[in-house]
């Protein structure tokens, strides 16, 4: 369900995961007023899918740097500032320019980095060296953001083309109406329900995030560091994590999975929706006179705030319809899960030895975190991680022949 609301005006978009024959489909939804023909519309399912992808829980990936190189670099900086090109490693080069690569990951069709920087000219140099085209003289603008303590989201397009799909499911129905009641009727759908039902609510509002007033709104567990193999079973991980979270809240909570200004994202699971897409979803307050109407939204004042809510409900635990309120809270939140890839080089400096020892504790913490989040058996997790009894792996020690011919 997508709810676009400002004041008393609401546009409700109802998607469906109906799998049967179209002739068997029936939908009954209470509405606050008699709807005229012009208040009813058939929407584009791809736009709802886009909104779902944009706000979906996401994996982010970090890659550990060579501890020997980092130790060498730190020692050098204590004595003399390195000239450009002293270190070929990308991380070290960035540091030489006062730029820190805070995160590196691939999400969807984008290769993404999150950067922080000390000086705008160093950041501008790094961006140009790495083929992120910035206009000449961008240093001043970059500097204004740095003074605000902001980070920089940079992306390159992954050119692999997504498969094109047709309408495999029923298209969503939309209705536009005015009512002081900001609510979503769910009770009728539970009458003949076979077990608990799953519901996603995407709220698009002008001022801030949306929450339920008659049920607790709880943030989904987030920012957890989990084992690398979860990347291959992320759907299973999230399914079981959500189930565990629902049980911990006694099956009575509505979970916040995403809250963000539509004008940007960090990281982006998918690009923000275009102005045309948002208007199709009922964001009627967009300034249509603003130039570049088909571009992604930029500027302040009209950008909708996106709230993604997720609940598993039945009549026993959700006896009332969902009642919402819009708040002035524009703080960002997302379901975000971290994969940290260890460095696997053969260098055997003292920093590397200490680094390898530290991996054991890190793996143990990742495994216990995963078990707590999902209810998965810890021994099964250990098996999937390919660790020994002390949480070490084969890559934690340098083989004798790797020491013979160091590069």
Task: Please give the residue ranges for each predicted region.
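Coil-to-beta-strand transition motifs
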Residues: 9-11, 22, 107-111, 150, ...
């Amino acid at each position: 369900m997508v709810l676009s609301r400002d004041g008393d005006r609401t546009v409700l978009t109802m998607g469906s995961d109906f799998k049967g024959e179209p002739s068997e489909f029936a939908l009954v939804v209470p509405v606050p007023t008699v709807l005229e023909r012009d208040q009813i519309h058939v929407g584009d399912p791809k736009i709802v899918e886009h909104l779902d992808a944009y706000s979906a829980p996401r994996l982010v990936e970090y890659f550990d740097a060579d501890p020997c190189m980092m130790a060498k670099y730190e020692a050098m900086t204590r004595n003399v500032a390195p000239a450009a090109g002293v270190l070929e490693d990308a991380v070290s080069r960035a540091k030489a320019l006062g730029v820190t690569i805070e995160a590196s990951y691939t999400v969807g069709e984008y290769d993404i980095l999150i950067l922080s920087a000390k000086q705008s000219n160093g950041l501008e140099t790094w961006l140009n060296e790495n083929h992120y085209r910035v206009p000449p003289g961008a240093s001043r603008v970059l500097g204004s953001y740095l003074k605000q303590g902001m980070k920089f989201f940079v992306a390159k397009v992954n050119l692999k083309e997504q498969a094109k799909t047709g309408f495999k499911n029923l298209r969503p129905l939309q209705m536009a109406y005015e009512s002081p009641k900001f609510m979503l009727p769910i009770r009728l759908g539970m009458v003949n329900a076979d077990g608990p039902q799953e519901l996603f609510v995407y709220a698009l509002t002008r001022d801030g995030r949306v929450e339920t007033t008659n049920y607790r709104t709880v943030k989904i567990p987030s920012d957890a560091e989990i084992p690398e193999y979860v990347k291959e079973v992320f759907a299973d991980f999230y399914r079981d994590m959500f189930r565990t979270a629902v049980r911990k809240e006694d099956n009575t909570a509505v979970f916040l999975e995403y809250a963000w200004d539509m004008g940007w994202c960090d990281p982006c699971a998918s690009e923000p929706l275009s102005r045309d897409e948002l208007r199709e979803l009922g964001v009627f307050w967009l300034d249509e006179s603003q130039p570049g109407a088909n571009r992604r939204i930029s500027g302040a004042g009209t950008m909708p705030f996106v709230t993604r809510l997720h609940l598993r409900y039945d009549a026993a635990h959700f006896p009332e319809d969902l009642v919402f309120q819009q708040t002035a809270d524009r703080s960002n939140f997302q379901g975000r899960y971290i994969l940290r890839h260890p460095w696997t080089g053969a260098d055997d400096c003292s920093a590397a030895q200490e680094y390898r020892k530290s991996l054991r504790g890190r793996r143990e913490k990742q495994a216990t975190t995963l078990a707590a989040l999902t209810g998965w058996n810890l021994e099964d997790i250990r098996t999937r991680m390919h660790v020994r009894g002390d949480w070490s792996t084969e890559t934690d020690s340098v083989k004798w022949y790797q020491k013979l011919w160091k590069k």
